[in-house]
Amino acid sequence: MKRYVLFVCLLLSGLAGVYAQSIAPFQKGDRIAFVGNSITCGGHYHSYIWLYYMTRFPDQRIDIFNEGVGGDVAEMIYQRLDKVFEHEPTVVTLSFGMNDVGYMDFRKPGADTIARNRVEKACRDYALIEEVYKKYPEVRKILIGSSPYDETSRFNKVAFPGKNTPILEIVDFLNARAR
């Protein structure tokens, strides 16, 4: 069984590059705004990127702006996006999806329909975000798919069965938009 799990993990990690954008490294002087929800706000991944650049390329200074806000959904990101551009970023990353699909609705009857409606709304709201992006053609945009949700965890004694499926639908949508 352990060999099977290891094989599946290796296979999936090998396929990850198939769906990834080809992203150029940050350049000296880049001003990167990481936009998203609480995963961006408190996830620290942007500080690891900054630290990597500072320790590996000390002569290539980059500036990082944490523009993550806990609880945000795509609509809320759209509503505050002009403020993000006040920092005059040269690169903007965007991640959303976890909050967009909701939480407690997955424990209710009709959860699939509710989730489908939430995914559709998130995609419509992303179209509004793209309209703002068009005002800044010189800014490089990077889409980051939401992290997966562990439906099997009992850490908080509350699981939301089916939550990962609509998150993956949003990730697939973003992958399609990135091409």
PLM region descriptions:
Residues M1-V35, I39-I62, D82, E86-E88:
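N-terminal secretory targeting modules
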Residues F26, S47-D63, D72-R179:
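Alpha-helical cap/lid subdomain in secreted, periplasmic
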Residues R31-F34, N66-V69, S95:
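Short glycine/serine/threonine-biased micro-segments
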Residues S38, G68-G70, S147:
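Catalytic nucleophile serine of serine hydrolases
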